[in-house]
Curated annotation (Swiss-Prot):
Signal peptide: none annotated. It holds the Pfam family DUF2043. The lineage of its organism: Eukaryota, Metazoa, Chordata, Craniata, Vertebrata. InterPro entries: ENTH_VHS (IPR008942), UVSSA (IPR018610), UVSSA_C (IPR049431), UVSSA_N_a-solenoid_rpt (IPR049408). One of its GO terms (cellular component) is site of DNA damage. The gene is Uvssa. This is UV-stimulated scaffold protein A. A zinc finger (UVSSA-type) spans 574-601. Residues 234-253, 269-304, 392-415, 451-507, 598-637, 649-669 are annotated as: Disordered. Residues 2-145 are annotated as: VHS-like.
Length: 720
């Protein structure tokens, strides 16, 4: 009975489900009703499960406790006697021992425990004094708010307040840094915006009044939308309040002031609404401007108009404003693009970051407004550039790129003085003096040049390499001459079978050039690779024991080893193993000669059977040997069925063909060892990996060794 009770409690608490199994819970209640000893035993088992470091186990155990608490007086007496420990395990009232993970299950456990304790106090508080005292302790000492949805204790609220203060401090420091950055970069941003606006004025020289820098793009877009023809009449061109009419005999030259004023009248004629002059404008200047163009004939003459008898219709394109890139505005466009690139890549992200920092901190409202204004100005500059619709010239870009490429090519060349006595072309009658062959006729050269050019270059390169005594080709030629001369000069009789076999093996053996490793072959004590130290005769800095010879391990290793570069051609493996696996699939490994699981790779059909009869017979023999080694009664599946029927362990796990993977004890519970896939966890996995730590330790040791070697003779550093 005790074994059955412990098994039921273990299964119920380790199920990992939010609700208990009703059938098993019914069996547990039945066992607890049988005797008080079983009830006490169940209480001890439940308290043991409540001490587990897993919130899901504690939650299931608490649900069982709640069921038994409402039904048994004996269980209530046992629980109230250990009520403080129960509160620490279910509510986490002890600050030093909070509830274990997972966090969601711990939160549900705390909420369920608070509701249960409050209900127990209302129902059984008068009969059980310790229960009422525990409720009073939670409410008044631990400051637990039973109406709080999150059911937080005083310690938890303090922790959250400290966490919030820490976040506020971080946001405040970030806002302070943003304030300093803003004070440093505001002037630079203003200069960049001014440069962009000046470039825009040079590209689109519209004059629409005193506020043209703020409205010329908006006015131009408004004109493009209302592309109706506007009639121009001399009445519109006549200044208001002039009161003068009739021709004027004197011809006055057109000056810059006339052009500016005329531009104002032309803008009003085509429908551009220029804003009214400011109230603070000087009235004397206004009177002078009206008096200068009081005569309509002078106005017509300055604009190239003949008479008042015709009208002008001005049609604006509907596709908006366009700027054509040419040689005149190329420098301005380059300057504007550089400034806009600086705005887009540096200033605008920085300003957006300032706005976010000031918003999170909730302070520096003036700086926040200034940052928002800067952001709007930067975005407006980018929008203006998009509205320009700059069309690159046809040949402008190609000419610019060609000019830059030519400048780079000129910079790559280095001026070298001409060699004295150098003749770029040798005459035909002097070729014999230089040891050159006479030139072939032109027809012969034209005939054979295309065929023999590659072969001739290859042959000349080989001859040049062979002529150099320090090259590998010259060494190979010398070795070939040495090997061929004794074989050609010596005349031997017929060779015996052993000598013939040795000669055949020598012929098949690869030729290895002579090296340092062959020079010291078989020598145990090498004379080379030793460092000889000269004996010093000074009596002060001479050590007591002097090693006259020091062996260098690196040099000794070089004398015994040789690095040979593979000069062959890599051929990828095309075939597969295709052996039949236990799951019915074919092995897809692409080893060259031997599969590590199925042995030598042989040709097989689509079912994994060998195509060669010899291989098929060999595999059948191997299968028979395996069957003899493992009888049929040792089949893992058969043994598992017998174990399930009899309840006796026959050792089926020992004969199982599966790997020795560690089986989880409670697979339904959340694995606490599996960490959340967060950025911090991934960084910790990489930074604190065993290999990374070893590399860091090796680098630090190397730094210390270098420092020691550099300052070992100085007592000031040697003592540190």
């Amino acid at each position: 009975m005790d074994q059955k009770l412990s098994q039921l409690i273990e299964e119920l608490t380790t199920s990992g489900e939010s609700q208990l199994n009703a059938q098993k819970m019914k069996e547990l209640k039945k066992i607890c009703k049988s005797s008080e000893e079983q009830l006490s035993h169940a209480y001890r088992l439940l308290m043991t499960q409540l001490t587990q470091d897993h919130a899901e186990i504690r939650l299931s155990a608490f649900q069982i406790v709640d069921e038994l608490f409402t039904r048994s007086h004996q269980f209530r007496v046992l629980l109230v006697s250990d009520f403080q420990e129960f509160l620490e395990l279910t509510l986490g009232t002890d600050n030093d021992h909070p509830l274990p993970p997972p966090r969601e299950a711990a939160q549900r456990l705390r909420q369920a425990a608070m509701q249960a304790v409050e209900g127990w106090n209302e129902k059984f508080g008068e009969a059980y004094k310790k229960l009422a005292l525990g409720y009073h302790f939670l409410k008044h000492t631990k400051k637990v708010d039973f109406r709080d949805i999150n059911v937080r204790t005083l310690a938890e609220r303090k922790r959250e307040e400290e966490k919030q203060k820490h976040l506020d401090k971080i946001h405040r420091e970030s806002a302070d840094r943003a304030k300093r950055e803003m004070e440093e970069m505001s002037d630079e941003i203003g200069c960049c915006l001014t440069e962009v606006e000046n470039c825009f004025r040079l590209l689109v020289p519209l004059d629409l009044g005193p506020y043209r820098e703020d409205k010329f793009f908006g006015e131009a877009s408004g004109i493009a939308e209302d592309h109706a023809p506007c009639a121009w009449s001399p009445d519109l061109a006549t200044p208001r309040g002039s009161g003068l009419s009739g021709p004027q005999d004197e011809e006055q030259p057109c000056c810059s002031k006339d052009l500016v004023a005329s531009a104002h009248h032309a803008g009003s004629a085509v429908g551009l609404k220029a804003p009214a002059p400011a109230a603070t404008e000087d009235p004397c200047r206004d009177e002078d401007r009206h008096s200068e163009h009081s005569d309509p004939e002078d106005f017509l003459r300055s604009h190239g108009l003949g008479s008042h008898k015709y009208t002008l219709d001005v049609e604006l394109p509907s596709d908006g404003l366009k700027v054509q890139e040419n040689e005149d505005n190329l420098a301005v466009l380059h300057a504007a693009r550089d400034s806009l690139k600086l705005i887009q890549n540096k200033f605008l992200p920085a300003v957006c970051s300032w706005v976010q920092r000031f918003t999170r901190a909730g302070i520096y409202s003036g700086h926040l407004k200034q940052a928002i204004d800067l952001k709007m100005e930067l975005e407006l500059a980018l929008k203006k550039y998009e509205e320009l619709n700059i069309e690159p010239g046809r040949g402008q870009r190609s000419r610019t790129e060609a000019l830059e490429d030519s400048e780079e090519e000129d910079q790559d060349f280095v001026e070298v003085p001409e060699k004295e006595g150098y003749e770029p072309r040798i005459p035909d009658h002097l070729r014999a003096e230089y040891g050159l062959e006479p030139k072939a006729p032109l027809k012969t050269l034209e005939k054979h040049t295309a065929v023999c050019s590659v072969q001739e270059r290859t042959r000349r390169r080989r001859e040049e390499e062979a002529s150099d005594p320090t090259s590998a080709a010259a060494q190979m030629l010398r070795l070939q001459d040495c090997l061929s001369s004794p074989s050609s000069s010596s005349t031997r009789g017929p060779l015996g079978p052993e000598e013939a076999q040795k000669q055949a093996e020598r012929a098949r053996a690869p030729m290895v050039p002579f090296g340092v490793d062959l020079c010291y072959w078989g020598q145990e004590q090498l004379t080379a690779g030793k460092i000889l130290k000269s004996d010093s005769q000074h009596r002060f800095w001479k050590p007591h024991e002097v090693e006259e010879e020091v062996d260098s391990a690196h040099v000794s290793e070089m004398l015994h080893s040789r690095h040979i570069t593979f000069s062959g051609k890599f051929e990828p493996v095309q075939h597969k193993c295709r052996a039949l696996r236990p799951n019915g699939r074919l092995c897809e490994r692409q080893d060259r000669l031997k599969c590590p699981f199925h042995g030598k790779i042989i040709p097989r059909d689509d079912k994994g059977q060998p195509l060669n009869p010899e291989d098929r017979a060999r595999e059948q023999r191997q299968q028979l040997q395996q069957q003899r080694a493992h009888p049929d009664w040792q089949d893992p599946e058969f043994m598992k069925d017998v174990e399930a029927a009899t309840g006796v362990d026959l050792g089926s796990s020992k004969y199982s063909k599966k790997g020795k993977g560690k089986k989880k004890k409670h697979p339904n519970l959340t694995d606490l060892r599996e960490r959340a896939n967060t950025a911090r966890a991934r960084l910790e996995k990489k930074v604190f990996a065993k290999g990374a730590v070893q590399r860091v330790v090796a680098a630090m040791n190397q730094m210390d060794q270098k420092k020691h070697e550099k300052f070992a003779n100085q007592f000031n550093y040697a003592l540190k």
